[in-house]
A protein has these predicted regions:
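An N-terminal assembly and electron-transfer interface module characteristic of large anaerobic redox
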Residues: 1-288
């Protein structure tokens, strides 16, 4: 988690009479023991199944999703309130204090663009939720992580808004989405960003530029919009770069050639046959 997010979560919990504890996975066994003394566990990144299993064995209740955007935070506060049997009045007062601030932060920096989201961090779904609440169209969300019951709420929320959510997404899945959707911005891993740039589409590295900022609460709503809008504004520069480098080749024909590129069609054909043979052999083994 981004270092500021536990503080942002703590600010949401404070009016409920609660506090944020240790962040897990942790570095020291002392922190793990302190974490096991908690009243409940927020599975903010719901893919740490081994860590969650330890808390389940210790009899601790697990809360899925995360306090992102207005709807996500509203639902999360309800879940926390139910877990700790907090009075409805206190829950209502907490919402009145927190939710308008998040809404204002989202309204101040509207994102009226189409964005694809992919990565391997585990926070892709909650980032997409925040972007949609900020006004963005997000047709595709891909995560390399598996589907777990702690991400079900986020998945259902996204799918109800027409988002295609892909768990265990491959690089091919992510690149295919970028090509077919032709977004105003592609957020993804290094090869996804490289492919988007080749296509002249503004792009952001998920790990460096999305995970490296707060996502939760009021701070998260504002900080995400800032970097997104700045990247989208580079669209015309990307088009200029694409036209400037047009005709220099790509893949194994990239670069400046004095003559024709040294293509090796016979080598490609030979490799294709070898790959096909391996596929046939693998299929035969499955049948056995």
């Amino acid at each position: 988690m981004f270092p500021a997010d536990p503080m942002n979560i703590g600010a949401i919990l404070e009016p409920l009479g609660l506090a944020a504890g240790q962040v897990i996975p942790c570095r020291e066994w002392r922190e793990l023991y302190a974490a096991l003394d908690c009243g409940a566990v927020a599975a903010i990144h719901p893919f740490y199944t081994a860590a969650v299993r330890e808390f389940e064995d210790a009899g601790k209740p697990i809360i899925g999703s995360a306090p992102v955007g207005v709807e996500g935070t509203n639902s999360w506060i309800d879940s926390v309130g139910d877990t700790f049997n907090i009075a409805k009045k206190i829950i209502g007062e907490t919402k009145q204090k927190i939710l308008p601030q998040i809404q204002k932060s989202l309204d101040d920096k509207k994102i009226n663009n189409k964005i694809t989201v992919s990565g391997y961090e585990g926070s892709e779904l909650i980032v997409a939720r925040t972007l949609i609440e900020a006004g963005a169209q997000v047709p595709y969300v891909g995560t390399a992580c598996p589907k777990t019951k702690w991400s079900t709420e986020d998945k259902d929320w996204l799918e109800s808004r027409g988002v295609f959510v892909k768990f265990r997404a491959s690089l091919e899945d992510d690149i295919s989405a970028v090509k077919s959707v032709n977004p105003d911005l592609a957020i993804g891993t290094t090869p996804v960003v490289q492919k988007a740039k080749e296509l002249g589409i503004p792009s952001l590295y998920y790990t460096n530029l999305i995970s490296a900022r707060p996502i939760m609460g009021v701070a998260g709503a504002g900080s995400l919009a800032e970097v997104i809008l700045q990247a989208i504004s580079n669209g015309s520069r990307m088009e200029k770069m694409k036209s400037f480098f047009e005709g220099v080749g790509e893949g194994d024909t990239a670069g400046v050639w004095e003559g024709e590129p040294n293509l090796k069609p016979q080598f490609r054909a030979h490799q294709a046959k070898k790959i096909e043979k391996r596929k046939i052999a693998a299929k035969a083994e499955e049948m056995i």
